[in-house]
């Protein structure tokens, strides 16, 4: 068997030498080398691949150590006389934890709607939260008259027109029980984001608004 293989190899070499077929295709050689390397890597015997992996791990370790050094050093320089600490990396002032604690929360209330998504009143107790005394201090005379004639409807207008506080600051204020500005227009509320349910809520709000401000009330 060995003699036969040797004979075939010898004949092949002689043939290649006589026909110039020993000029191999570079693409074929490259493909062959890739196949050999892939098989060596699969068996774990490729030294070049192991070397690359080791170098990659070392680079990762060095980067982690450098990042830890930057964090541990404080990365800040105090500007003389200003009391501020500037980051040496970003150049942005660093806020102390004490300053963060001193920050006051948002004063503007986050309203909880008194209507459900269909425009129906959730609770009468919430409707009474805006008392007549508070209303009398802030409301113009015309709205006070409306309140005297129809307190429930007036409060619905004040607290429920913008049911979900969806568009703009004064709409949120309206849901929180504050009086709307004189230019308030229920038709201009951002209802489109609610889809079909928004149409129902808008119709409900507009009907309340019309009932409250109707002449002769």
Swiss-Prot record:
A GO CC term attached to the entry: extracellular region
Biological process, per Gene Ontology: collagen and cuticulin-based cuticle development
Observed effect of gene inactivation: RNAi-mediated knockdown causes dumpy body shape. Defects in cuticle integrity.
Major location category of this protein: nucleus
Record key words, sorted: Nucleus, Secreted, Signal
Location in or out of the cell: Nucleus; Secreted
Cleaved signal peptide residues: 1-21
Superkingdom classification of source: Eukaryota
General function of this protein: Probably acts downstream of the Wnt signaling pathway.
Protein name: Protein dao-4
């Amino acid at each position: 068997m060995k003699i036969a293989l040797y004979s075939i190899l010898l004949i092949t070499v002689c043939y290649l030498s006589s026909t110039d077929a020993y000029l191999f295709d570079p693409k074929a050689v490259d493909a062959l080398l890739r196949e050999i390397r892939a098989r060596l890597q699969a068996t774990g015997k490729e030294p070049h691949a192991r070397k690359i992996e080791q170098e990659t791990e070392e680079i990762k370790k060095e980067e982690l150590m450098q990042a830890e050094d930057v964090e541990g050093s404080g990365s800040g320089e105090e500007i003389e006389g200003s009391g501020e600490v500037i980051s040496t990396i970003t150049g942005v002032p660093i806020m102390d934890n004490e300053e963060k604690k001193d920050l006051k929360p948002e004063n503007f209330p986050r309203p909880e709607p008194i209507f459900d998504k269909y425009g129906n009143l959730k609770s009468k107790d919430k409707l009474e939260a805006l008392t007549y005394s508070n209303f009398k201090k802030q409301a113009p005379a015309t709205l006070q008259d409306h309140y005297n004639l129809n307190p429930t409807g007036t409060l619905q207008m004040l607290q429920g027109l913008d049911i979900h506080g969806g568009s703009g600051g004064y709409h949120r204020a309206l849901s929180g029980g504050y009086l709307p500005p004189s230019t308030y227009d229920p038709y201009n509320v951002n209802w489109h984001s609610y889809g079909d349910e928004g149409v129902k809520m808008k119709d409900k709000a507009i009907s309340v608004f019309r009932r409250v401000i109707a002449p002769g009330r």
